[in-house]
């Protein structure tokens, strides 16, 4: 049975199974096993390029690494007696090519810079995947919005009927939020995109490594500028978790409204059966389970963020084993976000919105009262606060008809709106929810023309974000393909 080579120098004795399990990071290490092989290959090419390792051990090691890359890291390397996959893999390599060859791969390197590099590689891939999903979600929102620019519905504040708007205007509000999430993740990617490799434990190394060369092989924009910060920093991970948590907060809000809207007493939307479940006892039930679970996932991602911040808040420079406990929270958080966003896109794209039901609710709760007050200002010259008081008093009396408004004007401001020229026909026209929407034709407003402009502008931004994600993904995968090609040439 292979043993942990790292313990055989300074430490003696055997550990109990409970202690091995407590210290091991194997579950999280499965996320970085492939990235770790890429790091090994880049490091080995760097050692050879600088003349630090001879050709014979370098070729033997590269052949063994390529075999692992092609066929997978053996399960034994994930045994908890090794603490982590790095030690398990090193034991495998030494067993395969001998210690004289296998024991040379770790020259000029520590697990500290090795794992930090692996995490950044995988996190870059996760960011790109999340960005691609956000691009698809935003496209869905824009497409659905484009079909509902004239679908009038109630808008809410405090969950009370407030003012009429359109379904397109509502959906575009969420598209704007997810657009900002995209921007945040793009910015975070730039801070993740630096290579710690070559920083060793924290004080770099006396071996003449070319850190820019290995950074390029691994698809990084540059090497990290300070070797201590390179291994100690996890703020980049916290930043991505924060971005994912903000994104999932918007997701949760949207899911909450889909749950509410799909109820029988609201009836604004019918979710596709694929995104719902039934009851084991109540045969009529159609429960919006996907939206509910997604709503809860937002809490899970926020929990991962809180855990990551708490784990790192009191750590001294530079590397501390506490950071091992952060990594599972990082993977769980980004995975929950990455899984949720495509499902939300599918749920929205397959949903059926009831335009008639929305229109019927659009004028309830005196939702056009604001427009009536505005008309008293724009067309009859009243101060807004006076108009606000008159309309509010009429609402208190239970009606916005001419007689009630006249009584409210005399009661609240001691004058006559009838004498100003207000008519029953004017009131009826103003209180039409479609009128209230149509006159709000300014930048960002719900009028069809304003909404069309928003859709056009956001489609242009979406196209740029989509191109960036595709180009970045292509560049990263291209770097990995080039690395594997160089590794195969080297081993041949």
Curated annotation (Swiss-Prot):
Claim: Cytoplasm is one of the keywords in the record: yes
Record EC number: 4.3.2.1
GO molecular function, one term: argininosuccinate lyase activity
UniProt xrefs under SUPFAM superfamilies: L-aspartase-like
Cited InterPro entries: Arg_succ_lyase_C, Argininosuccinate_lyase, Fumarase/histidase_N, Fumarate_lyase_fam, Fumarate_lyase_N, L-Aspartase-like
Reactions catalysed: 2-(N(omega)-L-arginino)succinate = fumarate + L-arginine
Keywords assigned: Amino-acid biosynthesis, Arginine biosynthesis, Cytoplasm, Lyase
Pathway participation: Amino-acid biosynthesis; L-arginine biosynthesis; L-arginine from L-ornithine and carbamoyl phosphate: step 3/3
Subcellular location: Cytoplasm
GO biological process: arginine biosynthetic process via ornithine; L-arginine biosynthetic process
GO CC terms of this entry: cytosol
Keyword Iron: no
Protein name: Argininosuccinate lyase
Organism: Methanoculleus marisnigri (strain ATCC 35101 / DSM 1498 / JR1)
Organism phylogeny: Archaea, Methanobacteriati, Methanobacteriota, Stenosarchaea group, Methanomicrobia
Gene this protein is translated from: argH
């Amino acid at each position: 049975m292979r043993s942990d080579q790292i313990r055989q120098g300074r430490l003696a004795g055997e550990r109990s199974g409970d202690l091995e399990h407590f210290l091991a990071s194997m579950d999280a290490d499965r996320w970085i096993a492939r990235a770790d092989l890429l790091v090994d290959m880049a490091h080995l090419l760097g050692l050879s390029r600088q003349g630090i390792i001879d050709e014979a051990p370098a070729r033997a090691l590269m052949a063994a690494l390529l075999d692992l890359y092609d066929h997978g890291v053996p399960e034994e390397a994930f045994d908890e007696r090794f603490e982590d996959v790095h030690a398990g893999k090193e034991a495998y390599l030494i067993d395969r090519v001998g210690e004289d060859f296998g024991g040379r791969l770790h020259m000029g390197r520590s697990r500290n810079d090795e794992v930090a590099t692996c995490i950044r590689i995988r996190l870059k891939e996760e960011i790109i995947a999340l960005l691609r999903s956000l691009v698809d979600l935003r496209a869905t929102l824009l497409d659905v919005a484009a079909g509902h620019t004239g679908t009038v519905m109630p808008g809410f504040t405090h969950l009370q009927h407030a003012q009429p708007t359109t379904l397109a205007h509502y959906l575009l509000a969420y598209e704007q939020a997810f657009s900002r999430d995209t921007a945040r993740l793009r910015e975070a990617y730039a801070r993740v995109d630096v290579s710690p490799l070559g920083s060793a434990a924290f004080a770099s190394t006396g071996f003449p490594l070319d850190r820019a060369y290995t950074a390029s092989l691994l698809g990084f924009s540059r090497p990290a500028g300070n070797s201590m910060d390179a291994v100690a920093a996890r703020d980049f991970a916290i930043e991505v978790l924060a971005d994912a948590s903000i994104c999932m907060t918007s997701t949760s809000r949207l899911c909450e409204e889909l749950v509410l809207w799909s109820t029988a007493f609201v009836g604004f939307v019918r979710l596709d059966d694929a995104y719902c479940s039934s009851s084991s006892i109540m045969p009529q039930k159609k429960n919006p389970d996907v939206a509910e679970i997604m709503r809860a996932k937002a809490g899970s991602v926020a929990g991962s963020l809180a855990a990551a911040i708490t784990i790192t808040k009191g750590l001294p420079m530079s590397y501390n084993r506490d950071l091992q406990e952060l990594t599972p929270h990082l993977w769980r958080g980004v995975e929950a976000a990455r899984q949720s966003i495509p499902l939300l896109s599918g749920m929205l794209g397959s949903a059926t919105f009831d335009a008639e039901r929305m229109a019927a609710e659009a004028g309830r709760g005196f939702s056009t009262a604001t427009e009536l007050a505005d008309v008293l200002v724009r067309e009859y010259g009243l101060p807004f606060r006076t108009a606000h008081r008159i309309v509010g008093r009429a609402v208190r009396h239970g009606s916005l008809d001419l007689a009630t408004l006249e009584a409210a004007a005399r009661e609240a401001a001691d004058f006559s709106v009838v004498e100003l020229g207000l008519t029953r026909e004017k009131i009826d026209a103003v209180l039409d929810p479609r009128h209230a929407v149509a006159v709000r034709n300014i930048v960002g407003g719900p009028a069809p023309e304003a909404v069309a402009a928003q859709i056009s502008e956001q489609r242009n931004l979406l196209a740029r974000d989509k191109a960036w994600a595709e180009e970045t993904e292509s560049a990263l995968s291209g770097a990995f393909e080039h690395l594997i090609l160089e590794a195969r040439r080297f081993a041949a």
